[in-house]
Amino acid sequence: FPPWM
């Protein structure tokens, strides 16, 4: 889970 998601 990317930080920008």
Curated annotation (Swiss-Prot):
Provide the GO biological process annotations.
Answer: defense response
Chief subcellular location: secreted
Q: Name one GO cellular component term.
A: extracellular region
Record's subcellular location: Secreted
Record key words, sorted: Amidation, Amphibian defense peptide, Secreted
Does the keyword Secreted feature in the UniProt annotation?
A: yes
Give the protein name, as stated in the record: Tryptophyllin-T2-4
Query: Which organism's genome codes for this protein?
Result: Pithecopus azureus
